[in-house]
Amino acid sequence: MKFLDEAKVYIRSGDGGNGCVAFRREKFIEFGGPSGGNGGRGGDVIVEVADGLNTLIDYRYQQHFKAPKGTNGMGSDRHGANGKAIVLKVPLGTQIIDEDRETLIHDFTTVGERFVLAEGGNGGFGNAHFKSSTNRAPRNANPGQPGEERWIWLRLKLIADAGLVGLPNAGKSTFLSKVSAAKPKIADYPFTTLHPQLGVVNAGDREFVLADIPGLIEGAHEGTGLGDRFLGHVERCRVLLHLVDATCEHAGKAYKTVRGELEAYAGTLAEKVEIVALNKIDAVSVEDLKKQRDRLKRAANKMPLLLSGITGKGVPEVLQTLAAVIGEAPVSDKAKGAGASAAQAVVPPVAQAKPWSP
């Protein structure tokens, strides 16, 4: 299934049905009086979180959604039927944003959660409604009220416990494929990963969801490369695992490049708990590894973990550290409502990972 995390949608709720002007016409009843019924209410537009969805791809092929209008009132005091509501299914973690792309309308954090995005118009009154002691035969009725219409943006922010960040080719996808059942595309060229990937990781008696996003390069916040739009998918993570390639020219500069993009991002990513790890240690000499480790230590102000995603060396220690920090890190306010359902509702339908072993 293709991945789509943003879609522009037009929605319109149903108009209310018109009221009816009618009079009783029965044998032996000379002055039957008014009998026009009220119009039905227009259908609502409702957005609902569906279990098992992990993309907004359905909204690439259909962008216009209109609820049916209410039925007009009829004679013999028959009221019109209400229009049927239409329900838009979205994944857990979806946000509804106004057309200006800045105003947040609603944020979904629970499976099954519903939000009425546009209410249908009220039905008009029939002439029976206007009958009074001074007006025994009213000949007026109200038209139905129009429904609401608007353009909105649906934006998906995946809910995971930990997020992988780093430059392109830092080994993030390889690491994810080794510790979970996820099968991201892996190759030796930059930007192999074009869309976020999720995997469920078992670390001893702990289980957590790990998100891999496309690599960041200098100037990503200005649109360079794939930009920083995918950072929204790790905005709700408790912990960031920052992988740095040991074979790069300068590990410290590589680390600072990514940190600069995190700080330039509008969210709170730069304030999140961060675990720094030096990857691909099997591909460098002992002397170069020590030099890169010292550079990274000075840049990050902490001792980095060492690992190799290919051989598995150091991976158990990284997973245990991740699991421990996840248990202690504060949960984002927006992610609290997701609870244990996040892994079920957001993770693509891949096999559950077995406890990792080298």
Swiss-Prot record:
Residues of the signal peptide: none
Ranges of residues in domain OBG-type G: 160-327
Database matches in Gene3D superfamilies: GTP1/OBG domain (2.70.210.12), P-loop containing nucleotide triphosphate hydrolases (3.40.50.300)
Record: residues binding Mg(2+): S173, T193
GO CC entries: cytoplasm
Keywords for this protein: Cytoplasm, GTP-binding, Hydrolase, Magnesium, Metal-binding, Nucleotide-binding
The protein's required cofactors: Mg(2+)
Alphabetized InterPro entries for the sequence: G_OBG (IPR031167), GTP-bd (IPR006073), GTP-bd_Obg/CgtA (IPR014100), GTP1-OBG_CS (IPR006074), GTP1_OBG_dom (IPR006169), GTP1_OBG_dom_sf (IPR036726), OBG_GTPase (IPR045086), P-loop_NTPase (IPR027417)
Top-tier EC class: hydrolase
Record-listed E.C. numbers: 3.6.5.-
Binding positions for GTP per the UniProt entry: 166-173, 191-195, 212-215, 279-282, 308-310
A biological process term (GO) from this entry: ribosome biogenesis
Span of domain Obg: 1-159
Quaternary structure (record): Monomer.
Function: An essential GTPase which binds GTP, GDP and possibly (p)ppGpp with moderate affinity, with high nucleotide exchange rates and a fairly low GTP hydrolysis rate. Plays a role in control of the cell cycle, stress response, ribosome biogenesis and in those bacteria that undergo differentiation, in morphogenesis control.
Family to which the UniProt record says this protein belongs: Belongs to the TRAFAC class OBG-HflX-like GTPase superfamily. OBG GTPase family.
NCBIfam families: Obg_CgtA (TIGR02729), PRK12297.1 (NF008955), PRK12299.1 (NF008956)
Protein name: GTPase Obg
Source species: Nitrobacter hamburgensis (strain DSM 10229 / NCIMB 13809 / X14)
